[in-house]
């Protein structure tokens, strides 16, 4: 999709950071619990591209599957992914000279407590099914605030559940930025 000159983006291979792709691949292919007593890759994409679309939009949809983003920077296509990592820089009041931190956050109404994730099921020949994910503590505190999510290219109930769980945890815990 990225390098093909006929139907792809015609991005030269020299513009791709193979280490970014390898790192993302390792994280995506790591086996995790599927919720049914087995294991499956953390992220799997089953997608057929059969219509013309803006290449950038297709790439962003595909990278969103693994909580990533692709952008062109420093002469190459760079992949970044939301995943556990070590801190790269500790920012605190001792790092700021003659200034104050300004914080902004999200309103509680914007934070969801349940997610309904639409995915396609292999067992029912690709029919759309829904995985309901609930943050019990948040529901007890704020009530039911639903978020509908369409999991593009997702055929796994376990992956759909992880998508919903990550969305809810992110909205409840990552509410303030500086």
Set out the residue ranges of the language-model regions.
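C-terminal extracytoplasmic interaction modules
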Residues: 1-178
